[in-house]
Regions:
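Non-catalytic substrate-recognition/targeting regions of SAM-dependent transferases
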Residues: 1-56, 65
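Conserved class I S-adenosyl-L-methionine
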Residues: 75-86
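Conserved SAM-binding loop of SAM-dependent methyltransferases across substrates and taxa
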Residues: 87-99
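Conserved SAM-binding motif I beta-strand of class I
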Residues: 100-105
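S-adenosyl-L-methionine
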Residues: 107-153
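Mobile active-site "lid"/loop adjacent to the S-adenosyl-L-methionine
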Residues: 108-110, 132-136, 149-180
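Short glycine-dipeptide loop
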Residues: 180, 185-192
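C-terminal catalytic and target-recognition region of SAM-dependent MTase-like enzymes
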Residues: 189-248
């Protein structure tokens, strides 16, 4: 284990204990039921869940900064589709940058949480469409409707179920889903972002899939590991990978 020399470890507010059977539970010392954290102009409401999450993946801030800059300098309205959108970090970042956003997640509770984050961030009246839906079925319906988006963000879980029990396994489904999503890209797409927290989807794999499926748009692809810097050691705590396609 990494030596825990920082004095903050002696005053931690909570400790998540993993179970050998899967899952785990929190041990609370001095932790409120809910608290807020700020990133630039965004405010997020956090609370602990039995599956370890607190409602935010802070390592995604590097992606928020990247696509926010692209949206701000696009000189046109950008329609963004955020799939598996969780508590709305990417949704709020895109909306704050001036985009018109469609936020889709299969969990009603997560969409409600994302709306609360929007209110806390001063984005209550931003052009965000909130949808509780199975992401694959939503995209299939958008294809039939003829709707298109200038940018797509997806943060798929390793494993999940839709509102009606639809099963999602990322290794089996992600490539075909990326291909499906290209059918709702506009004629002048700005970017396409895929996040992965599964070890089997390394940056090279994300690069291959994005390069293959978005070849007709003649953009550039960059994939990389993302993580959180550890102040004490100077090391980076690995937190998954991101694949970015962007227009030239």
């Amino acid at each position: 284990d990494t030596p825990k020399k920082n004095r903050g470890w002696k005053h931690m507010n909570g400790h998540y204990h993993r179970s050998k059977k899967g899952g785990g539970e929190w041990e609370f010392f001095d932790l409120p039921k809910q608290w807020q954290i700020h990133y630039k102009d965004l405010t997020f409401n956090l609370k602990p869940f039995n599956f370890k999450h607190t409602g935010l993946f802070p390592e995604q801030a590097t992606n928020w900064d990247w696509f926010s800059d692209k949206i701000k300098h696009a000189d046109r309205e950008i329609r963004v589709l955020n799939l598996f959108a969780y508590t709305g970090g990417a949704t709020l970042a895109a909306a704050a940058a001036g985009a018109k956003v469609t936020h889709v997640d299969a969990s009603k509770g997560m969409v409600t949480w994302a709306k609360e984050n929007a209110v806390s961030s001063g984005l209550k009246d931003a052009p965000i469409r909130w949808l509780v839906d199975d992401c694959v079925k939503f995209v299939e319906r958008e294809i039939r409707r003829g709707n298109h988006y200038d940018a797509i963000i997806m943060d798929p879980p390793s494993y999940g179920r839709g509102p009606k029990g639809e099963i999602w396994k990322i290794e089996d489904s992600i490539h075909s889903f990326i291909k499906l999503c290209t059918k709702i890209l506009s004629d002048d797409p700005l970017f396409f972002l895929v996040n992965s927290y599964t070890t089997g989807l390394a940056p090279a794999v994300l690069t291959y899939m994005l390069s293959t499926e978005l070849a007709p748009w003649n953009g550039t692809v960059e994939s990389q590991e993302i993580g959180l810097p550890v102040t004490e050691s100077g090391l980076i705590l690995p937190c998954g990978a991101s694949g970015r396609w962007e227009a030239k």
